[in-house]
Amino acid sequence: MGAGCCVDRWCLVAERAVPSAVVVLLLPVGDDDAGLSKWPDYDRAVLVYSMSVSVDGYIADRDGAFGWTAPSDELFAFHLARVRELGAHLCGRRLYETMLPWETDPSLRDTELGAEFADVWSALPKVVFSRTLDSVQGNARLADSSVAEGVATALGATDRDVEIGGAGLAAAAIGLGLVDELRIFRIPIVVGGGTPYLPPVTEDIPLDLIETRTFGLRVIYERYQRVHADSD
């Protein structure tokens, strides 16, 4: 949810490939029970980059593994409520392929919440940025424009938040100054290298910390809003 995007790139799928990675799901809760904050109240849709991140800033370790991002029941409920609120998801090939089993694998619907998540994810409009894919499935389409144009189109088509992931695509959007919020699920582990959550930047990007939350003794949620030049 993948690591955080979604349900940690989503570890719930990784469970199939790495049985020790996670145990799925959980308690039916509504959006209020999941504790989603509606603040700040933007007057437009915003672009969000959300992932689970190690203490030293990585979304996957040096072997490409991210089983350590496996969510608790409480955290998965929060992720599920978040995805319900999205208007679209922009993703790269790897994240798209990681999440595709939610649309194609009937065994992921074995539980009530598994089926619920599969329905929510399948219905979510997705734009896939890839130089190698010739086609995509379900409610997804291949991007036929630049990242900037794709983001503008997605934001213009909804009044809900739009999420972007994995790291390469998000890095391009950050470099273009397009990401409005960073939502980090900080996992208490140091992995020493791997895929960084954030790219190198050539100029400082000022942020406001607008929300924090803890999930048990393991995860800290950090929500940052980019400070725009015209902010007070």
Q: What do these predicted ranges mean?
A:
Residues 1-232:
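Enzymes that bind and transform nitrogen-containing heteroaromatic metabolites
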